[in-house]
């Protein structure tokens, strides 16, 4: 099997106790896989008893949190299971997070997620043009009846072209317009089962008039995202304050002031490449290529909105605050299956998620 990873993947090393929002104590649900639970059932002595008493067996296996944290953290926020049983007997979630993996025929794609602050730092501070590294690994090919090799080959080709667009010197708003055009056109080809035409597609920028910008459109996107499952109460409070403040007075002035600062650390282009790598090929299975593009663009719009709100509130935006916005947003949106499913439905049926309305926002914000 061939492993594909982003070029920055090997830079990641867990900072463990130094992490400010450690995934072991930040209120995260810590899921356990069946093999790990079965092993824990066999562990002898007091530690084995403690393991079994700490597992919640209802619905899905997970640890019962204590004060929002894993019950096996010591005073230095390090893992008792690691020390007592070794890393080979930690759950899959514990050993793999923030890594994610998807399988496409004889390819396995693995990356690191923005919900981890160290992973987010690596992604946003990277200075190289985005590219994928391939390695041969000793792992059996993943079989899925819904996998279509020809469609996958076409979407891979389109994705590589979009990476080239993002790595080019084209204006950022123009790049996002190319993504939106590509989303609409490739979706039409998928709907017609014209997979060979996908292989021939070359993204290009077409200058055109856009719809007049409507501030209500951004609020409609916020309403969609704010109606979903809440994983952290800080998110609810932040969005409440943002929507009550940012769009109540002189939004254009705040946006203009933020853009004039030209903060060098925002890395919005790097976020797009992250989303392209992580999500675009998933349309091989659900055939919703356009929805993946809308997801990327909507996420980018809201993350910039969060940045502008902090700029208005504090008179400035620090690199640390920007990183925290991305970290908080990713944790709420990307790490809830229910939220991702809800958004997938919205991208299919909600009028706000279309090329024309999203492009009018993009042209105003970026």
Predicted segments with their positions:
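General N-terminal leader/first-domain-start detector
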Residues: 1-47
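General secretory precursor processing signal
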Residues: 17, 22, 26-27, 73, ...
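Internal, well-ordered alpha/beta segment that forms a basic, Gly-enriched binding/recognition surface
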Residues: 77, 84-180
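Hydrophobic, aromatic-lined core segments that form the binding pocket/scaffold
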Residues: 171-366
């Amino acid at each position: 099997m061939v492993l594909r990873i982003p070029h920055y993947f090997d830079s990641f090393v867990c900072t463990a106790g130094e992490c400010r929002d450690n995934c072991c104590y930040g209120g995260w649900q810590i899921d356990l896989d069946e093999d790990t639970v079965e092993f824990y059932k066999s562990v002898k002595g007091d530690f084995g008893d403690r393991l079994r008493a700490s597992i919640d067996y209802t619905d899905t296996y997970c640890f019962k949190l204590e004060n929002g944290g894993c019950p096996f953290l010591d005073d230095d926020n390090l893992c008792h299971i690691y020390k007592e049983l070794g890393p080979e007997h930690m759950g899959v979630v514990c050993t793999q997070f923030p890594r994610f993996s998807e399988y496409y025929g004889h390819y396995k794609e693995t990356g690191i997620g923005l919900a981890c602050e160290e992973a987010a730092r690596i992604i946003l501070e990277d200075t190289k043009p985005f590219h994928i590294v391939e390695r041969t690994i000793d792992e059996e090919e993943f079989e899925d009846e819904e996998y279509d090799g020809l469609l996958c080959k076409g979407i891979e080709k389109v994705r590589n072209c979009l990476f080239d667009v993002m790595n080019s010197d084209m204006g950022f708003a123009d790049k996002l317009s190319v993504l939106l055009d590509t989303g609409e056109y490739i979706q039409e080809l998928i709907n017609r089962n014209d997979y060979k035409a996908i292989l021939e597609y070359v993204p290009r920028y077409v200058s055109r008039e856009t719809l007049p910008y409507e501030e209500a459109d951004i609020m409609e996107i916020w309403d969609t995202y704010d109606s979903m499952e809440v994983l952290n109460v800080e998110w609810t409070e932040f969005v409440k304050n943002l929507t009550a403040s940012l769009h109540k007075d002189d939004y254009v002035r705040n946006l203009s002031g933020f853009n004039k600062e030209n903060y060098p650390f925002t890395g919005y282009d790097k976020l797009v490449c992250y989303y392209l790598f992580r999500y675009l090929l998933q349309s091989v299975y659900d055939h919703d290529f356009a929805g993946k593009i809308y997801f990327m663009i909507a996420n980018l719009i809201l993350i910039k909105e969060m940045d502008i709100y902090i700029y208005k509130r504090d008179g400035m935006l620090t690199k640390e605050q920007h990183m925290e916005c991305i970290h908080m947003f990713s944790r709420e949106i990307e790490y809830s299956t229910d939220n991702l499913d809800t958004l997938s439905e919205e991208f299919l049926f909600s009028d706000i998620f279309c090329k024309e309305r999203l492009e009018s926002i993009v042209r105003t914000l970026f």
